[in-house]
């Protein structure tokens, strides 16, 4: 038996070596986990953030992101070499969307389509480098993945990142600088007409990038007005667009207003509703993007929408982008 064993040992050793070549790189790579987005129990507060938004890993490691919110997000890495890629629209992707799992080394774009709670996406990083992570839906939602050579020590464990993600989530969702209750009307609105604040939010940064709290609610008492009066909606959200939509939602692109919307002299959009069966869509109202040195300044955006109600009734409306998160309201019109 002993002689048979040694006669076969060279072949046996060769098989061991081959198996080691295949298995050891996989065994050496680590699997890391992070999350995308977070939300309050009623979905009214949305954390537009990668949690955590800064991770150190080794080359060959993978990260799996789990989507934890009803608001749409993407996990996207844009190409950086040989030249930096222009930022695409979230609906276009790289163009196109990546298979899962994906590989990223900076030479070609990787992006998910817009995803929501329950989805996951995994990326393997085969080469060392510092790679910016972005959400193509939300400009102020960024992060960074530091991919180190195998010889370099990692500063943190998965436990650290789990704790950091929980702490960042609590900090964003419990932000007390803003109140999203029914009495939280801002003092900057001076009109005597009914006022509704559309959304709200706050952008914060840390060494890893930017995160945003977004309030997916119409803030303020349900307007109670008389026939012939006007209600004005004004956006306080620094990041997300919203709509004010009465009746049937428009088919197709929700960006433009419906055909029965006009523009006032101050740039606000305006519509007249004569019946509870009328359909009116504001189109997107949103804050203008931040100006940047060396680029043409951003044009003014549409931040207000007004509706004049000619007849009594109760008029329900929604944000066509975020109604599934509970962003709904109504206007009560008395004689």
Language-model-detected regions and their locations in the chain:
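Prokaryotic Sec-type signal peptides and long signal-anchor helices
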Residues: 10, 16, 288-290
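Extracytoplasmic copper-binding redox domains, predominantly the cupredoxin/blue-copper superfamily
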Residues: 29-335
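N-terminal secretory signal peptides that target proteins for export/translocation
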Residues: 1-11
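Bacterial N-terminal signal peptides
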Residues: 14-25
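Extreme N-terminus of proteins, especially the signal/transit-peptide cleavage junction
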Residues: 7, 26-30
């Amino acid at each position: 038996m002993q002689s048979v064993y040694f006669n076969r040992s060279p072949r046996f050793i060769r098989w061991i070596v081959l198996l080691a070549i295949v298995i050891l790189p996989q065994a050496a790579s680590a699997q890391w986990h992070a999350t995308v987005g977070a939300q309050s129990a009623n979905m009214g507060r949305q954390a537009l953030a990668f949690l955590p938004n800064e991770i150190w890993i080794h080359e060959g490691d993978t990260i799996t992101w789990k989507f934890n919110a009803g608001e749409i997000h993407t996990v996207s890495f844009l190409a950086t070499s040989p030249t930096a890629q222009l930022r695409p629209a979230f609906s276009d992707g790289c163009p196109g969307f990546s298979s899962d799992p994906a590989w990223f080394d900076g030479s070609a774009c990787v992006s998910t389509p817009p995803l929501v709670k329950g989805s996951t996406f995994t990326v393997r990083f085969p080469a060392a480098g510092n790679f910016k992570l972005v959400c193509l839906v939300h400009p102020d939602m960024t992060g960074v993945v530091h991919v180190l050579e195998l010889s370099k020590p990692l500063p943190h464990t998965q436990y650290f990142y789990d704790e950091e993600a929980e702490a960042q989530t609590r900090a964003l969702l419990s932000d007390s600088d803003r109140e999203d209750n029914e009495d939280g009307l801002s003092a900057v609105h001076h009109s005597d007409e009914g006022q509704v604040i559309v959304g709200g939010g706050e952008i914060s940064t840390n060494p890893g990038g930017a995160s945003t709290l977004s309030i997916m609610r119409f803030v303020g008492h349900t307007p109670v007005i008389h026939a012939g009066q006007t209600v004005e909606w004004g956006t306080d959200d620094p990041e997300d667009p919203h709509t004010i939509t009465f009746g049937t939602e428009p088919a197709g692109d929700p960006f433009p207003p419906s055909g029965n919307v006009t523009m006032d002299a101050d740039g606000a959009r305006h519509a007249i509703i004569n019946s509870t069966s009328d359909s009116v869509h504001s189109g997107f109202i949103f804050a203008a993007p931040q100006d940047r040195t060396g680029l043409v300044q951003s044009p003014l955006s549409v931040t207000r929408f007004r509706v004049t109600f000619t007849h009594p009734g109760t008029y329900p409306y929604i944000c066509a982008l975020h109604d599934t998160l509970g962003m709904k309201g109504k206007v009560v019109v008395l004689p």
